[in-house]
């Protein structure tokens, strides 16, 4: 069963707001990223709407300050298809927290991580608004995680005493427009960020001695160089493509895909027996 999801948009000059049904190919799609609030419904969260506050800017500043389509696609898939009850889940690049919130409401303990501390105040508010103040500390943890930082990765691992069960990420694999040459884009170029993300996923996957954590990653193709990340992943992970039939019907024809990764057994043995020096990743 699928549920529609909805968003708040301004409807007139007085800036009053109304709840407007969303479709991926509808006229309102581009407005969703600029809306102050978005509201989502999920089939397994009956009688509950998730409200997410956004602070995205039209100039592209603060990419984590809006809910991108991949976050909804991943959250919607996970709540229907993956049993997360009593699991310890790590979200990489959580942004405004939609995926983490949904999994928490499905009774997982979720460690929401991001490399941008400026997002944390709004992220905390989204958690409180949807999970409840009394449950936030019981069911979630917000952690700074800059990809490749050994100390921060160890802090995340230590939040799961019995080991990480699941790792999730949405819209973290992207390359900026290669025609735009500036410092910010260079810092986010594929040859810098993709190896860091790969090593982070590999490290976090190597420390559960009982089982290998499953990784679910939602991805929307933008530029061809993004394929280099998946080439890296194939070196150490078994890769499964989630069927498009299992994706929300609004996105079946979109370019959003969900991948499932599982660390290869021989890689897990190597990583757990050979420890690198601190912060060497």
Where are these regions (language model features)?
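S-adenosylmethionine-dependent methyltransferases
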Residues: 2-281
